[in-house]
Amino acid sequence: MTRRIVLIEDDPDIARLVDDMLTDAGHEVDVRSTLADGTIDRDTQLVITDLVALRGYDLQAARAWIARVRAAFPEAAVIVSTAHQPAGVAGASGLGADAVLTKPFDVDVFTRTVESLLGA
């Protein structure tokens, strides 16, 4: 079953890699460099986001970013993919996300996390 995924990633190389992995797995991927790019599709099942809106990686700013993502895609699960996890975050729940993957991430872990959140 094709699932709609929005990928918010400002690094074009990482965006291309993740897009290829998800597309190869049969998903429809909308790649954006910011939350504002593109239209809001309420049928989106999953959002994978870097903490692209942040200049630093403090906990309050990260939580605010995830809240903006959730407001834009209220029905979607959210994965944070980041090279710099904010200090004080013990896991996804600390950010308000469903999962946090630290870059560079293991492809198998990434795939299992995506499929788990999509209910596949």
Question: In which residue ranges do the predicted regions lie?
Answer:
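Conserved acidic carboxylate
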Residues: 9, 82
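The C-terminal output helix
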Residues: 115-120
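Alpha4 helix (beta4-alpha4-beta5 surface) of REC/receiver domains from two-component response regulators
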Residues: 60, 64, 83-101
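Two-component/phosphorelay signaling modules centered on CheY-like receiver
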Residues: 11-31, 36
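Conserved phosphotransfer microenvironments
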Residues: 48-69
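Conserved phosphotransfer cores of two-component systems
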Residues: 41-42, 67-75
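Acidic, metal-coordinating helix/loop segments flanking the phosphotransfer/catalytic sites
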Residues: 28-46, 54
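C-terminal output helix
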Residues: 105-114
